[in-house]
Amino acid sequence: MQYLCQRCHSLINFKDVYDDDLLKLKNLPKSRFVQASSLTEMNESGESDDQMNSSSEDYPAQRLQLYKKTISEGDYNFDNVPPPELRTPTLDSFVVLPAAKDGYEEEKNSPEEVNDLFSWKIEIYNRIFDLLSSKTKVDHPLCVECAELLTEEMSKTLRALKEEKKMYFNYDNFLSSQTVHEENTAALDSEIDELMKQINEKEEKIEEISDETDKLQKLLRELDEEKEKVYAEEQEFYNNLNQFQIKKLSLERQYDCANLEFEHNSRKLEKLQKMNVFSDIFYISHYSEPNGEGSIATINGLRLGRLPSQKVNWAEINAAWGMTVLLLDVLTEKLDFHSSSYQLKPFGSQSFIIRFDRDPNGNQVKPTKLDLFSSGELKIFMNRRFDQGMVAFLDYLHQFGDFCAAKTPSAVLPYAIENDRIGGKCIRLAFNQDENWTRALKFVLTDIKFLEAYVSSQDKQSNF
């Protein structure tokens, strides 16, 4: 028969007892149960102890007294003892049937007795282990090593309890040996009264402190509420500040963009202000002959005039006259100049000028159309109209120059104009050399270029 130790879970081997002896012991509890029940009945019937002693001659008197005391104080009931069986099997335990020993005579006991014997052994062990487990804080069964360790621990506990008992006993003796005198009692009473007075004062002070604590707690709650309110206001302030910062950054970006755009436009405006629109549209220059025999004035690349060494066709000359008329008309319109004697009509290569004549009475007669172009034919009438047109154009230019000089005295034409001459050169084509006529036309374009610069400067000043 083997069990497991409830502490280390190792196997526990029990020494087998001879079955004959167990059979003898098996009958012993039954006789004791009978005697116990008989003792109980005798107590209930009022029999004396002597009678009980006489009926229990098998037991010593001292053991019988202990047994009776145990029965009377305990809650044991032996009337309904069940037959031996495994009622409370031990956990983690098992039974191993031992092999037959040498020399054991199986024929002495019947199989029923052998089975009953093993059941009874299991029941006895289980009862013992249950009893030990209920009386101690340790589950049973235990192996030898665990039992020794438990014994040592319980011995240490016992020694500690004995020491504690001894200490209490000595202290009790010390208190018992102290004698209290009446003076000491009076002094102690006075001291007790003083202590009670101090206790009362402390209690009053505690109440005052408690009241002050309540006030402080109330003030603390108010401060907490104020803190929450301030925190909420702070959060709102920072939210507004963040929104303001975002808006500020957006406005700063817009401001930077506007500044960049303004700087760009300012540079562009400055560039445009420095730019002479008239000179860009009507570019006036001159064309020099390779052999150095003279130069011809040009407007937008069109030659205005001709030289003996280079015969310029009249289509180019007429186109150059058309550009010249258009430029002078734009300049006069820009300064709001109006002549009472002439009116320019720019029509490209067929441009002309209208002259308004008056009779001796000052009345205006029919306007005269004067051409500023020529076909190149040697017809006196055609050249006469062309010459009159160029003289009228020169007079119109002279009037416009005087108009500009009246506004700005320093604005004097580079080449003076007098009747049909400019810079001392006649502008008529008839009875004139090509070199002189071409030079007169060059002086005309030079004066117009001067007026062009003047009008451009006046335009810039008006813009500012």
Swiss-Prot record:
Keywords, in A-Z order: Autophagy, Coiled coil, Cytoplasm, Endosome, Membrane, Phosphoprotein, Protein transport, Transport, Vacuole
Region (BARA): 275-461
Region (Disordered): 38-57
Primary subcellular site in the record, as a coarse category: membrane
One annotated GO molecular function: protein-macromolecule adaptor activity
Coiled coil: 144-274
GO BP, sorted A to Z: autophagosome assembly; cellular response to nitrogen starvation; late endosome to vacuole transport; macroautophagy; mitophagy; phosphatidylinositol biosynthetic process; protein transport
Record carries keyword Cell membrane: no
UniProt cross-references to InterPro entries, sorted A to Z: Atg6/Beclin, Atg6/Beclin_C_sf, Atg6/beclin_CC, Atg6_BARA
Subcellular location: Endosome membrane; Vacuole membrane; Preautophagosomal structure membrane; Cytoplasm
Subunit structure: Component of the autophagy-specific vps34 PI3-kinase complex I composed of vps15, atg6, pik3/vps34, atg14 and atg38. Also a component of the vps34 PI3-kinase complex II composed of atg6, pik3, vps15 and vps38.
Family statement drawn from the similarity comment of this UniProt entry: Belongs to the beclin family.
Xref: PANTHER family: BECLIN 1, BECLIN-1
Name listed for the protein in its UniProt record: Vacuolar protein sorting-associated protein atg6
